[in-house]
Amino acid sequence: MKKRVIIIGGGVAGMQTALRLAEQGVSPVIIEKEAELGGKLRGWHVLFPSFTPASEILTELRRRIAERGIEVMTRTEARGFSREGVQLPDGRMLACDSVVVCSGFT
């Protein structure tokens, strides 16, 4: 049975973590509080020093997430986590083997 890992945060770190876990045969689930994946990258124009448009990077990451069939839960926050899993605001508990916090920065 595949291990299930909940990733809290759907920014670049969360998406990259999910992709790496999927490559290792793990079943990742991304929980993102916003309506779409991307985190701070959604508000950036270009990346330094290459001046690659941020939208290109974001589009590619989202494509790879979808291609891998990684479960994504947007507009969802984690209220807490324990040995049983991650608790959602509606009281549901998402069972998992591990939790990775990729909550980003402000």
Whereabouts are the PLM-identified features?
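FAD-binding core/adjacent interface of flavoenzyme oxidoreductases
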Residues: M1-I8, A66-T106
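Beta1-alpha1 glycine-rich phosphate/pyrophosphate-binding loop at the start
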Residues: K3-R68
